[in-house]
Swiss-Prot record:
<dbReference type="Pfam" id="PF04545">
    <property type="entry name" value="Sigma70_r4"/>
</dbReference>
<keyword id="KW-0731">Sigma factor</keyword>
<dbReference type="InterPro" id="IPR014284">
    <property type="entry name" value="RNA_pol_sigma-70_dom"/>
</dbReference>
<feature type="region of interest" description="Sigma-70 factor domain-2">
    <location>
        <begin position="390"/>
        <end position="460"/>
    </location>
</feature>
<keyword id="KW-0963">Cytoplasm</keyword>
<dbReference type="InterPro" id="IPR028630">
    <property type="entry name" value="Sigma70_RpoD"/>
</dbReference>
<dbReference type="GO" id="GO:0003677">
    <property type="term" value="F:DNA binding"/>
</dbReference>
<dbReference type="InterPro" id="IPR050239">
    <property type="entry name" value="Sigma-70_RNA_pol_init_factors"/>
</dbReference>
<dbReference type="Pfam" id="PF04539">
    <property type="entry name" value="Sigma70_r3"/>
</dbReference>
<dbReference type="Pfam" id="PF03979">
    <property type="entry name" value="Sigma70_r1_1"/>
</dbReference>
<feature type="short sequence motif" description="Interaction with polymerase core subunit RpoC">
    <location>
        <begin position="414"/>
        <end position="417"/>
    </location>
</feature>
<keyword id="KW-0238">DNA-binding</keyword>
<keyword id="KW-0804">Transcription</keyword>
<dbReference type="InterPro" id="IPR007631">
    <property type="entry name" value="RNA_pol_sigma_70_non-ess"/>
</dbReference>
<dbReference type="GO" id="GO:0016987">
    <property type="term" value="F:sigma factor activity"/>
</dbReference>
<dbReference type="InterPro" id="IPR013325">
    <property type="entry name" value="RNA_pol_sigma_r2"/>
</dbReference>
<feature type="compositionally biased region" description="Acidic residues">
    <location>
        <begin position="196"/>
        <end position="218"/>
    </location>
</feature>
Amino acid sequence: MANERPAQQSDIKLLISKGLEQGYLTYAEVNDHLPDDLVDPEQIEDIISMINGMGIDVHEVAPDAETLLLNDGNTGNREVDDTAAEEAAAALTALDTEGGRTTDPVRMYMREMGTVELLTREGEIAIAKRIEEGLSQVQAALGVFPLSTEMLLADYEAHKEGKKRLAEIVVGFNDLIEEADAAAAALAAAGPVAVSDDEAVDEDDDEDGDDEAAEEEAGPTGPDPVEVATRMENLANEYAKFKKVYAKNGAEHKLVVKAREDMAAIFTTLKLPLPLTDALVTQLRGVVNGIKDHERKVLHLATTVARMPRKDFIRSWEGNQTNLEWVEDALKRKQKWSSALRDVKDQIISEQQGSIEMEKANYLTLGEIKEISRAMAYGEAKARKAKKEMVEANLRLVISIAKKYTNRGLQFLDLIQEGNIGLMKAVDKFEYRRGYKFSTYATWWIRQAITRSIADQARTIRIPVHMIETINKLNRISRQMLQQFGREATPEELAKEMDMPEDKIRKVMKIAKEPISMETPIGDDEDSHLGDFIEDTNVESPIDNTTNINLSETVRDVLAGLTPREAKVLRMRFGIDMNTDHTLEEVGKQFDVTRERIRQIEAKALRKLRHPSRSEQLRSFLDID
């Protein structure tokens, strides 16, 4: 494909040059220069339109001289621009081959990925701020939802009891972050500060320690537990005050609204971890779904069962979700559906009472809950869109890292998929204030996701990650010792080098062996498989099988030389061609004689078989082990 494209461009360049020179082209000439696999009429029309846009007319047949003279009279006087012809040829070739490149999923992925521009440091910061704004809007919405505060306080109580870590509840303080941002902005607006030569020298000397300082800053120290305890205590006090005011005045009183705002002001100063935020969002969404469930049931009863027009229902229902007199008010209108509505009155009131109970349980009106849900959804959508942009702009980074892990048991597309999962985790945890680029931070998450997936999925029998790391270390040291001594290292030498017990080294070496498929091709022609060369101990060997068949045939031939009675007695006594052998008593009953007589017949038959003329045929089988 790569070798064909330059040739196609050259042919199309000549075609365009010819068209510019003579002022026209025929459909036959254009068709001769198009790829054979291009059959889409729309693409062919696009190519014709592009040629027409260059000032070249396309005709069914070549026009005569008079027609050309009537069309601007410039036949043969067009200047052929080689650069324009090359650009047009490249564009047409790209268009021609577009259809042939859409069947391969890898090519499609790469092409779509390449359409997204790379981000600069400023672009990364801008997107990170949008993500932060979206999450802040989500937390602001959760802050005015009282049950979110209740869950947060319950989790903090679990932390005090030792059931949860503090990092699972609070990871920082939003107000302190905003103050630091404001201070940094003021410092940047003030311009560069003049420093003395001595200070400049000191800064140069400290450059070597910048990396260590950055690493130290990047280390998660966590919020101050004392400060967290103080804010949690204040939040608990505000929550108790809110519940007291609510119990006295109801949800819509201005004192209740003020108490809820005071509670939300403290709630939003706490920076919550993503898992806890997701749990709070799920809780609010569950409440909203419960409200919608009640409303859907009322809608079904009123419009489907009672046949109330949907427009009438929506117009009268809005604002009356918890008004238990709504059905009576609707019945007073005395419409043709009134009788059916009266039949479902009790069911509708039951659903309304369910909505009222939800209002009481959540300390909010239905309208307030829906408004909070809308604000939360808006923030989620904003953060989700920004995260999507950040991920799409860094997909190339995943490709470059995944290439280093090919041929390790996973397909390339699987490696890309796992790397993309790591990239999305990096987007969730990226903190632009620390000063490093996103790619620097994301590389670690992508690499970890890929290596973990290889450890979990590449082997037929899964090995724990810590054992995979030990195996990799063992293999690395084995290669080093092979290069050093020119021979394979012994388990004793490896145990000494790795500072591990020798029996554990042998165990790791045994675990490191990978299973191999029995369908693995063997030989240059690959017409046989490994399983063909493995002995099946459950099946009789061909030699033993052949020997047994020959022995059976020989025994039958020898017995044929005896009398029928003697042959049958021996067959029954030794179980020849029978399921089991028989006792003298059983054989005697068969022949209606005594057991002594059967013993005599058996002894006589065996004496006959010992004769050299007969025994020689059987003696050869005794030599076979």
